Structure formats: structure tokens, C-alpha cells
């Protein structure tokens, strides 16, 4: 098949593109500057961004399938995130409709649904985001439902926190663990979270590409189990082959750190990864159910927590990130 991918040079996107190439597909990817992880791979680069309708047309010409993974994950203003994640996605969707692309898969996020409380969230729960990024993804999903026609086949996937080789944000957790400390965000080691290895997100994306029924279909894609911080600590310690000491980080401390770091970054014109918005997200429980994607797309988790963390840490060590 001819497949067009946005966000193909990023963390999840580069793994998806590699999987598509291994399956023998012709892959074009939207590129703003460098191919990064895809350098040397037999991909067809299409220079441009989501504002460049002509580039989108070029990428989708004759395409059998479009994967939309490009997104802005942080910005100091809601309108900046909305412009990238909602308006940019609408440009892509409308261009795909005009090009007659038979299947579109778009990456959303658990952040669009919001945190969980008494049980893992399902696709039937109302969307209640608590971060600016989550709001932008919620608005993106709502735009898709408004814009989709009766003949469209669109799948929205919502992963939680994604880890694996090439990931640069959760990396900081493993770097701290490499010094013998396991930070427990929120302070409760028994708090439960969903997280997923990038290989399983790619599996979900590939399966979603095969679902050709008309309509908009939404799925969480995650680990089949939810984990506690204690389980994450144990798996990380085993992979690092060292004992980890717990460092509880109460919500107020995390929020203070996010606020302080954001203000400090502002002095230098930077918006840091840890900011007030991110701190607000980090202090909640985030769990989701994968029963729907298991039932309808036959999804099965392929990497356990222990195997996934071990695989990730080995890659970080091999590339001198740890």
C-alpha cells in the first residue's frame, strides 16, 4: 500500500514507519526539517507542515491509508496548542477527504479523556481533560466527529504515557533511577497508572489501519494491566540491577516545582517540559481499559512491564542516554 504519515520523524512515528517499511509498504512522511531517526530509510520525504495544503496533497496523492501522528505536546498558551492540534488536524482531514483516502488513523491521547478515579476509563466515558494539551486533543476529537462524512473510515487511538527507545521525556525518570532514586509522583506508591511500550502502540496503529468500516471509531491503546508505582520501581530496579530508594513527591511539591521551573524558563524564553500544566497532570491517576480494542481489533499486549522497561533501558544505555 501507499501510506502517508505525519509525525513520522518523531518518537512513536519513527517506530511506526519502520514497521510499515518492514511490511513492504511505500511510505511517505511529512518532514519539516530533518529525517532524524529515519535517515537512511527508504521513505519518501514530503517537505512541509500541517499548514501547507499543497504538501499534504502531495503526500496523499494515491494514498491508501493516512496516519496522523504529528502534534504539539506543550506550549504556554491554549490557543497555540489548539492551532497545531485542532486546526492542523482539520487541514489534514479535509485534504484526505478531498483526495479520497479510504482510511485515516489519528493519534489522540488519554489526556483528552482526563484522569481516572474509581476505575479505568472506557471509551464511553465523557471527555474531561485537565491540561491544555488534553483540551486540544479533546477539541481535535470533537472536530473529527463534526467533519467526518458518512463515507469516511476514521480511527482515533488514545494511548496513555508511552515509553520505549527514543523517548525523551520519561527518560528523565530512568536517569534519576540510574542514580538509585525512584521518584513517586503524587507520593502514593500504590497509585495506579496505565502506560504502554511504543511497540504496542505501533501494534494498535497497524491494527487500526485494517479497520475499514465507515464511521469514527475510538480506542484506548495501552497495557492490558494497570501498574502501581511500586511495580514500576521493582521492574526498573531489576533492569538497572540496583536497589532503588523511594522518594515520595507529594502533589503540592510537584505543583510548586512545575510553577517554579516554568517561571525560571520564562526568564530565558523557554517553556520547560515540567511546567504548571504538566505538574497538574502528573499528580492524578491515569488508567484506561483496553477491552474494546482487544474485542474489536484483536489487540494483545506484547511487552510486559518488566520486558518493556528492560528493553528501553538497554537501548538508553547502548546510546549513552543513561
Regions found by a protein language model. Give the residues of each.
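Amphipathic terminal alpha-helices
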Residues: 291-295, 304-322
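Mid/C-terminal beta-alpha module of Rossmann-like enzyme folds, strongest
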Residues: 207-273, 290, 310-311
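Flexible, glycine-rich beta-alpha linker
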Residues: 114, 152-171
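NAD(P)H-binding glycine-rich loop region in Rossmannoid oxidoreductase-like domains
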Residues: 39, 47-87, 95, 110-115
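Substrate-positioning beta->alpha
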Residues: 139, 167-172, 187-209, 216-220
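Active-site Tyr-X1-5-Lys
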Residues: 130-155
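N-terminal Rossmann NAD(P)H-binding glycine-rich loop of SDR-like oxidoreductase domains
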Residues: 3-23
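Conserved Rossmann-fold NAD(P)-dependent oxidoreductase catalytic core, especially the SDR/UDP-sugar
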Residues: 87-133, 155
Amino acid at each position: 500500500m501507499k501510506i502517508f504519515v505525519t509525525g513520522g520523524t518523531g518518537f512513536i512515528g519513527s517506530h511506526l514507519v519502520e514497521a510499515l517499511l518492514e511490511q513492504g509498504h511505500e511510505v511517505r512522511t511529512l518532514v519539516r526539517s530533518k529525517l532524524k531517526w529515519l535517515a537512511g530509510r527508504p521513505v519518501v520525504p514530503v517537505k512541509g507542515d500541517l499548514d501547507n495544503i499543497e504538501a499534504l496533497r502531495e503526500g496523499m496523492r494515491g494514498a491508501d491509508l493516512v496516519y496522523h501522528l504529528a502534534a504539539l505536546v506543550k506550549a504556554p498558551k491554549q490557543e497555540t496548542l489548539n492551532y497545531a492540534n485542532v486546526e492542523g488536524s482539520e487541514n489534514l482531514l479535509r485534504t484526505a477527504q478531498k483526495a479520497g483516502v479510504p482510511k485515516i488513523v489519528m493519534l489522540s491521547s488519554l489526556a483528552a479523556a482526563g484522569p481516572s478515579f474509581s476505575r479505568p476509563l472506557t471509551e464511553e466515558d465523557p471527555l474531561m481533560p485537565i491540561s491544555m494539551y488534553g483540551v486540544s486533543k479533546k477539541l481535535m476529537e470533537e472536530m473529527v466527529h463534526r467533519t467526518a462524512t458518512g463515507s469516511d473510515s476514521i480511527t482515533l487511538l488514545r494511548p496513555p504515557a508511552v515509553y520505549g527507545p527514543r523517548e525523551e521525556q520519561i527518560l528523565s525518570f530512568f536517569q534519576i533511577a540510574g542514580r538509585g532514586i525512584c521518584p513517586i509522583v503524587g507520593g502514593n506508591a500504590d497509585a495506579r497508572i496505565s502506560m504502554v511500550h511504543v511497540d504496542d502502540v505501533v501494534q494498535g496503529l497497524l491494527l487500526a489501519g485494517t479497520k475499514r468500516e465507515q464511521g469514527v471509531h475510538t480506542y484506548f491503546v495501552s497495557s492490558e494491566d494497570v501498574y502501581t508505582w511500586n511495580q514500576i520501581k521493582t521492574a526498573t530496579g531489576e533492569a538497572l540491577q540496583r536497589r532503588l530508594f523511594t522518594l515520595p513527591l507529594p502533589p503540592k511539591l510537584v505543583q510548586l516545582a512545575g510553577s517554579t521551573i516554568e517561571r525560571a524558563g520564562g526568564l530565558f524564553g523557554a517553556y520547560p517540559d515540567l511546567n504548571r500544566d504538566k505538574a497538574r497532570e502528573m499528580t492524578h491517576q491515569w488508567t484506561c481499559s483496553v477491552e474494546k480494542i482487544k474485542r474489536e481489533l484483536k489487540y494483545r499486549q506484547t511487552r510486559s512491564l518488566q520486558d518493556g522497561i528492560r528493553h528501553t533501558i538497554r537501548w538508553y544505555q547502548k546510546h549513552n542516554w543513561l
